[in-house]
Amino acid sequence: HQHTTEMGLFIHSPQLAAQVLGYTLSAPAQYGITAAPQRFAWLNHGPYAVLLHATSAERKLWAEARWIELGKTLAAQGIRCVLPWGTAAEHERSTRLLQHIPQAVVPERLELSALAALLAQARVVVGTDTGLTHLAGALGVPTIGIYCATDPAATGLHACARGVNLGGIGAPPAVGEVVAAVGKLMMSNEL
């Protein structure tokens, strides 16, 4: 009688891998990933959040109205929202969000190294199930993963110390859940 497990589950869940291999993880994974600090002329001084609203599959998108509500809440707390993009459709979405989120910024299209620097210097990153959200977590940035069509147990932010997974298949998180998680992460980051 054999039991099989998908290898991807071990990659995304170091705790599970450790349990199967008979040892205990004493601390969150440290990836050794860093991003060179970078100053962005288009971004004023002060705290900012990166909102990674784009993803490779439309079914994984969080509703624009929810991003707007989140962005307005962050702006009211003095946190500027940055809305990066990679494709023309993502740029259009960033521009639509910009029209409703006070003090938000849509940067020029950024190379991966510049995106990494932007993420690393953020107060918090909130993103859909996308590679950049995982990069933020690996950089050690307080990160909220929003899941609308995938299972965070399989693809979530499991190996980062300051990552929170919200939502699930067919169950996108409410804005209030995301706002509460952002508040907790930012408060724990100040301690």
Residue ranges of predicted features:
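Catalytic machinery of carbohydrate-active enzymes
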Residues: 1-191
